């Protein structure tokens, strides 16, 4: 009886929390030093966000008054791209499926170099607040509003929905509290500094968070890799299929994670926030290589986890469990803070971008074209709350939040990729009719195929959406009465 009481008391304390998902009584080994590092870090992020508060104008709040320098731009691009969802997802996916991440990393490098060479400078010269604004400048307000709606939902799924799960997992492991309570605590912290600071605060917290992120991931990879016996220990212990490429899985992963980068609203908002076009371009090119190196490290950790952890561990908990189990005191706190840094930097950025879609692409474009600057800031802040709380709500209520993210990215990319890229780079005639029909048709086909699990030639639904969108766009535009040459700069 006394032992039962003692066990109950242990479960209620931080340092005696039990990992129920393993169904084993293994204690979390977070020391006082680890806790001090984590708490100081979390409070510091709120403090940095508050200190850099800027909401004097919409340009201040949404794009940092277009004054971000090279170092801050590079750090915020990296911290956002290699977010908690990307890290935990990459580690977990490698743990489950082996080297399937390799083609994705290569394609991401190519896409990031393309964005740096051909997109970043052009977007900064054009200027704006959101990616769907490019649709509005070329095809008209209805296309911008529809694109803004698609983009806002995509931002909600990628940011608060996915990242609240990652942060909730961390807090659950550390505190032993219910995971949903952890998700609520984490989202409250992120909302606090995002609402108060806007892009300046988000970018500066990203700057600090990237330092933690890079250092923590590097340390964690080195120690976990060594613990697994190095590459020879990994290759001799993991199942043979983990070292064989699943082509179908790789294609699906590339389509789901790489194609959205081409029209990612969060990425475009960074271009608009740079102090000049050269800064936007160089920071994007610089960020491309370390992003891929961080993803390679996550791949190594995932393979090492196959050696070090049980085979039935949920993939979303693999990264955090590695940190808790195999790192020494102090370094453990640093690396957990790094994981939280990755999560928070992605969540805040995507919330701000989604909120800007609401205020710029929907509210000002469709509801109140005469909105004042002050009204725009207020609507953007309300949008941050809406995107954050809706994303958290989806994560709390739905059994599979990944489905929400997949559907939103499928609709956004399937419908908007072709008209947006042609609007930016195409020199021929452009048509409102062709663009709108292709956006609706491509998005609808992609959604229908995804919901009904329709697979042709092993390709994911997003590819069907892009193909249908392209056929409609280039099939209708030459014959549309409203087709004309449009300068995107106007």
Indicate where each model-derived feature is located:
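Intrinsic disorder/low-complexity segments
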Residues: 9, 14-15, 215, 299
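Short, Lys/Arg-enriched N-terminal segments with co-localized hydrophobic residues
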Residues: 10-28
């Amino acid at each position: 009886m006394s032992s039962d009481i003692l066990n109950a008391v242990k479960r209620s304390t931080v340092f005696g929390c039990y990992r129920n998902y393993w169904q084993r009584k293994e204690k979390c080994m977070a020391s006082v030093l680890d806790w001090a590092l984590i708490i100081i870090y979390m409070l510091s992020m709120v403090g940095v966000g508050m200190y850099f508060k800027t909401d004097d104008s919409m340009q201040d709040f949404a794009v940092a008054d277009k004054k971000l320098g090279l170092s801050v731009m590079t750090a915020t691009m990296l911290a956002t791209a290699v977010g908690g969802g990307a890290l935990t997802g990459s580690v977990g996916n490698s743990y489950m499926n082996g080297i399937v991440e390799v083609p994705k990393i290569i394609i991401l490098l190519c896409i990031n170099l393309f964005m740096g060479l051909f997109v970043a400078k052009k977007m900064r010269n054009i200027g704006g607040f959101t990616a769907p604004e490019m649709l509005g400048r070329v095809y008209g307000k209805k296309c911008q509003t529809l694109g803004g709606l698609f983009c806002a939902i995509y931002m909600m799924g990628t940011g608060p929905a996915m990242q609240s799960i990652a942060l909730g997992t961390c807090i659950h492991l550390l505190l032993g509290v219910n995971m949903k309570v952890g998700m609520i605590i984490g989202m409250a912290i992120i909302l606090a500094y995002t609402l108060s600071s806007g892009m300046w605060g988000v970018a500066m917290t990203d700057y600090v968070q990237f330092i933690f992120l890079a250092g923590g991931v590097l340390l964690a990879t080195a120690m976990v890799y060594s613990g697994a016996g190095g590459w020879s220990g990994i290759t001799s212990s993991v199942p043979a299929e983990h070292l064989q490429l699943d082509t179908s899985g790789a294609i699906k992963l590339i389509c789901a994670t790489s194609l959205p980068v081409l029209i990612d609203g969060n990425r475009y908002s960074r271009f608009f926030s740079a102090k000049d076009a050269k800064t936007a371009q160089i920071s994007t090119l610089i960020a491309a290589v370390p992003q891929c190196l961080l993803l390679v490290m996550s791949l190594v950790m995932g393979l090492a986890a196959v050696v070090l952890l049980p085979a039935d561990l949920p993939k979303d908990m693999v990264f955090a469990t590695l940190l808790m189990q195999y790192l020494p005191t102090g370094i453990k706190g640093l690396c957990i803070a790094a994981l939280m840094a990755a999560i928070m930097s992605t969540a805040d950025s995507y919330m701000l971008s989604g909120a800007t879609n609401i205020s710029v692409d929907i509210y000002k474009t469709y509801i109140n074209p005469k909105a004042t600057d002050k009204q725009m800031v207020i609507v953007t802040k309300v949008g941050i709350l809406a995107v954050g709380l809706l994303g958290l709500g989806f994560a709390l209520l739905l059994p599979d939040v990944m489905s929400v993210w997949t559907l939103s990215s499928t609709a956004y990319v399937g419908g908007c990729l072709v008209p947006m890229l042609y609007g930016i780079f195409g020199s021929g005639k452009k048509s409102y009719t062709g663009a709108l029909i292709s956006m609706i048709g491509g998005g609808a086909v992609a959604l229908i195929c995804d919901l009904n699990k329709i697979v042709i030639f092993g390709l994911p639904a997003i590819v069907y959406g892009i193909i249908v969108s392209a056929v409609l766009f280039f099939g209708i535009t030459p014959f549309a009465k409203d087709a004309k040459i449009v300068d995107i700069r106007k």
